[in-house]
From Swiss-Prot:
This is Fumarate hydratase, mitochondrial. It is an enzyme of class 4 (lyase). One of its GO terms (cellular component) is mitochondrial matrix. Coiled coil: none annotated. One of its GO terms (molecular function) is fumarate hydratase activity. It comes from the Eukaryota. It comes from Schizosaccharomyces pombe (strain 972 / ATCC 24843). The record marks E386 as: Important for catalytic activity. Pathway: Carbohydrate metabolism; tricarboxylic acid cycle; (S)-malate from fumarate: step 1/1. The gene is fum1. Gene3D superfamilies: Fumarase/aspartase (C-terminal domain) (1.10.40.30), Fumarase/aspartase (Central domain) (1.20.200.10), Fumarase/aspartase (N-terminal domain) (1.10.275.10).
Amino acid sequence: MASVAHISTAKAIFRAGGLPCRRLITPTLTGLPLKTHRMNSTTPTYHLIPKGGKHGEFRQESDTFGPIQVPAEKYWGAQTQRSLQNFRIGGEKERLPLPLVRAFGVLKRAAASVNREFGLDPKLADAIEQAAQEVIDGRLDDNFPLVVFQTGSGTQSNMNSNEVIANRAIEILGGTLGSKKPVHPNDHVNMSQSSNDTFPTVMHIASVLQIHTHLLPAMKHLHRALKGKEEEFKNIIKIGRTHMQDATPLSLGQEFSGYVTQVGYGIERINNALPRLCLLAQGGTAVGTGLNTFEGFDVKVAEKVSKLTNIEFKTAPNKFEALAAHDAIVEMSGALNVIACSLMKIANDIRQLGSGPRCGLGELILPANEPGSSIMPGKVNPTQCEALTMVCAQVMGNHATITVAGASGHCELNVFKPLLAKNILSSIRLLGDACESFTDHCVVGIEPNYEGIARHLRDSLMLVTALNPHIGYDNCAKIAKTALKNKSTLKHEFVTLGFGTPEQFDEWVRPELMISAKKV
């Protein structure tokens, strides 16, 4: 068996409201960096196949509905095969996300370890743990073919994992696949469990792991890059814009400081929502009462999952809520939705400020990564901004779906679980990928267009605001309107209209003094 990653030290990095969510050392699955377990991770080239299993051949499996033929080269069983036949919806692209499959491996391994303490034959527990570890490692990925659109509790996918792990454990012990001896998918792999508590548990495990290992690092990467630009641009004075019209000046660094703060708040929002995702439903079984499990099973499973992942999970204090409602998923999706709003604003600003190169705002020079047009030679487009804003739109759509799904719990069970899992993992993956791409291929390469910035600052009529304390609002408005009408400068009209001398204008209208409050 693969060794368990034991915890030697523990450092709390996330805590809100007294609830648990600590990352213990570096998140791993028994020593494997979890970065390899992203939804887009390439699966290993050494997939396991049953001994003697040949493509095109079948073996007979059975469930309570009777016998059914299953491909001989696959480890799944009767219930998985029936689901394949009954839910032909969407094809391979709608399969359960791989992070969820790997989370099933984590949970089934943890459950087998704990069940050993409650009477499961140690020999069977060892074989189940070994098979579950192979699920974690990705060696059984192609044995999880089911689509998201199935029973709303995720029963088919839970049984898919039970059957695959059971058959692999049978093979490890020298038995016959499909015999359910000596390892039974329900009696042994699913011991002390129900799909109703198992699926929400793996939803949380998968989401937390992906957030810790992909999304948060990507957002921090973006935050650092924007912070660097804030510092780099702090002495560049430019014109501000409100309502897409000229406004008073600010520094380019100040403008970027807004972006830095938005991303920083986004990271805080994730951290604040994480503790509820670190609460596991396991132990509630069918309706939250814990029927057919053991006292303390829920706590021990959470502890075991924590050791396997190096992230602190706790058992949910109320299993009825954990099965019937998935507010923690909706809450996290809400945080991701806010982040999508922030990133769309940032990307649109950068795209607009970089518009041109000759007929736009032209205050930023964006990296040229690829040709932009199949018909217009030399054209370069703000492609990273466009990609990021499309991701943001998708995340907003995912949140709408999650909102409906989260509101659709009925009595003791929410029956939109697979859809919730698919969309939250999609949002996490997309935002993480997009933040990395936007940072590496756009933000770090942004340069100021000094000429364009200076021209806009010089020509802006809103510099007249600096004259307010000296000649009053109405007179300032008259200067601005006259300058616009005559296509002249503020300074010319200030003098021509008799409000002061050129020297007074130069003394009072100084953009570098207009970017902060007056000192008293």
